[in-house]
Amino acid sequence: MASVVVKTIWQSKEIHEAGDTPTGVESCSQLVPEAPRRVTSRAKGIPKKKKAVSFHGVEPQMSHQPMHWCLNLKRSSACTNVSLLNLAAMEPTDSTGTDSTVEDLSGQLTLAGPPASPTLPWDPDDADITEILSGVNSGLVRAKDSITSLKEKTNRVNQHVQSLQSECSVLSENLERRRQEAEELEGYCIQLKENCWKVTRSVEDAEIKTNVLKQNSALLEEKLRYLQQQLQDETPRRQEAELQEPEEKQEPEEKQEPEEKQKPEAGLSWNSLGPAATSQGCPGPPGSPDKPSRPHGLVPAGWGMGPRAGEGPYVSEQELQKLFTGIEELRREVSSLTARWHQEEGAVQEALRLLGGLGGRVDGFLGQWERAQREQAQTARDLQELRGRADELCTMVERSAVSVASLRSELEGLGPLKPILEEFGRQFQNSRRGPDLSMNLDRSHQGNCARCASQGSQLSTESLQQLLDRALTSLVDEVKQRGLTPACPSCQRLHKKILELERQALAKHVRAEALSSTLRLAQDEALRAKNLLLTDKMKPEEKMATLDHLHLKMCSLHDHLSNLPLEGSTGTMGGGSSAGTPPKQGGSAPEQ
């Protein structure tokens, strides 16, 4: 028979994997490698109460399902002073922490697995122990599923944050592209202004040239009128000269001398008539006084010389034709210049219209660019706030992961609970067959009432509520401080998701609290039953009464575990604490 060592698991680091050992041999240093000094103090004197890890959320499972120890829960930040006790079958090889314990124990009990014989001392389908174990397993499996769903939701939130960051980068690229387009438009506007200035200068030059051409055409028209008047004055004199020619041919001899005398007189008379004719006609322009002298010199040649009488009109007609052709060319040039000026004026008007439209577009674009700048600044602020919230969420998830890991390592040490409960069931079935079951019920109650009362006082609803308030104060403050509504819809959706994750984390925390208290109570009851069964000093009648009392306690604990909900709330904490309160049928009277 291997000796039984009672140990206390003080911290989460001291909880290690401890399964069913068929040989029942395991040293104390293997169970608790990190706390040898605490084991020594445990063996020497009264143990000091220290903080242990608490769990929450137990729901019974069907009796036909297999019992697996899938202990994977979220660790609670609040701790109680109830020690989490662990039992394992081991031989008395440890001389430091187990000698005193083994000496105190007068009886020995083999904690190996169930016997290989098919005939068991109890019913394998017993409703009490099987449903308790199945309920514990079901609660642990559900807690594991809830933690897995929380991790999946956290991954989805991270993916959404990454998509928002990609959208913000695309928006920044679009704003940079718009800024480049604005710079190109500014350069194009400057070029258009330069072109308009050049067109304006060319239009002014064209107007100056047109005015000069108009002045030249007016001068030419005045000269043409002057020449026409001279021709009109010259026509009657030419007719008189033609009539006088036959008379001069008939009397050449008689009038030679008078003709020679008349030539200078005629020249003098023409010279005297020339200025008179010029004074009678329209005066020429002041800038060309030499033009009327040309017909003034031609008329006396035709007047005084007979053979050259027809040269004067012929030369004047050629000059008139040249003048007319020059005037026509001038008119065509003026008309072409006018048409060109009209075209340039139309181009200038079109350019001005385009400039007006472009100015409106530039104003609109500047307004859009300013709005885009404001939106970019707002987006940058929202992105910064979103990054802060994402960092906080990542920190919270990391803390949750660390808590889950530590909780998993702690729950892996609860493996010995299964053989303890099985052994307790066997002993209970064997002990119920005794004859004196109800003789010393009150005396057995008096032996354990003080401890039950202490357990009930430690696991009261008020203490659990205080622990929960203390643990959740920081989280509630963070939620209240960050309860501001974000600006953009995406940030609002992300904020809602973060709040939902926080609520779920709070619910998981409360469920873990209730489950931890329930598991602690179950382990305490199992340890108490183990100690009672190992005591040889107790009489058989007292053993039977004590076992009956423990049976009643286990039934009440099973009822509380069956009624324990898995939804995280304050009422659940109260239910978990009420489940942990032992019944005060026989132990409350001596305590009072």
Curated annotation (Swiss-Prot):
It holds the Pfam family TSKS. Residues 234-264 have a biased composition (Basic and acidic residues). Residues 232-308, 566-592 are annotated as: Disordered. InterPro entries: TSKS (IPR028214). It is found in: Cytoplasm, Cytoskeleton, Microtubule organizing center, Centrosome, Centriole. Highly expressed in testis. Expressed at low levels in prostate, female breast, placenta, ovary and thymus. Phosphorylated on serine residue(s) by STK22A/TSSK1 and STK22B/TSSK2. Keywords: Cytoplasm, Cytoskeleton, Phosphoprotein. Its main location: cytoplasm. The modification Phosphoserine is found at residues 217, 288, 316. Residues 269-281 have a biased composition (Polar residues). GO terms for cellular component: centriole; cytoplasm. GO terms for molecular function: protein kinase binding. May play a role in testicular physiology, most probably in the process of spermatogenesis or spermatid development. This is Testis-specific serine kinase substrate. The lineage of its organism: Eukaryota, Metazoa, Chordata, Craniata, Vertebrata.
